[in-house]
UniProtKB/Swiss-Prot annotation:
Function: Catalyzes the GTP-dependent phosphorylation of the 3'-hydroxyl group of dephosphocoenzyme A to form coenzyme A (CoA).
Tagged with keyword GTP-binding: yes
Superkingdom of source: Archaea
Organism listed in the record: Pyrobaculum neutrophilum (strain DSM 2338 / JCM 9278 / NBRC 100436 / V24Sta)
Descriptive protein name: GTP-dependent dephospho-CoA kinase
Family note: Belongs to the GTP-dependent DPCK family.
EC top class, as a word: transferase
EC number(s) given by UniProt: 2.7.1.237
Coiled-coil portions: none
Catalytic activity entry: 3'-dephospho-CoA + GTP = GDP + CoA + H(+)
């Protein structure tokens, strides 16, 4: 993949797409777990420190995850022990670098924690684009919701959204 960055229409990327769960943990994770069970989800990918920590605390180890080791809540997050491999990448805010694309491509196979120097938020798009069928990508919305994206339902919409990103 190539490097992409947000140049305009940031509003399109801030909207809480697909399923927004406006509940605190552990209820939010129960809702997402029920959704995954109901639809036969085989892989769950998490993006974000708090989301990943909450899944692990609830006893659900994601297939793979991306974190930047920074949280708005200032919570310490240690999740590297649950993953077979750690990949470190540089990914500035608003970007998906080639290095980050490559890490996500490897991570969709499972067992990978991507540690991002910069910001991991945009990697949710890369996971949605590359995850296998029957996958769920979960991330936190800045206003407090847990967002769950059924990859099979939204991959085409994300492909269209990626067209708004500028090559870098």
């Amino acid at each position: 993949m190539r490097c992409l960055r947000i140049r305009e229409r940031r509003d399109l990327f801030a909207f809480p797409y697909p399923i927004a769960v406006w509940r605190e943990p552990p209820r939010s994770l129960e809702v997402v777990s029920d959704l995954a069970l109901s639809y036969g989800v085989e892989h769950i990918y998490t993006v974000g420190d708090v989301v990943t920590k909450n899944f692990l605390d609830y006893g659900v180890t994601p297939t793979s995850a991306a974190v930047d080791e920074k949280t708005r809540r200032g919570l310490p997050v240690e999740q590297h022990r649950k993953f077979q491999r750690v990949i470190k990448v540089v990914n500035p805010p608003g970007y998906i670098t080639e290095e980050a694309w490559a890490a996500v491509e490897e991570a969709v196979g499972g067992g990978v924690l991507i540690k991002v120097e910069g910001e991991e938020d945009m990697l949710a798009l890369a996971f949605i684009k590359m995850a296998p069928p029957r996958s769920l990508v979960v991330y936190g919305h800045y206003k407090g919701a847990l967002i769950a994206v059924m990859v099979d339902w939204y991959r085409d919409a994300i492909d269209r959204l990626l067209q708004y990103l500028e090559k870098c």
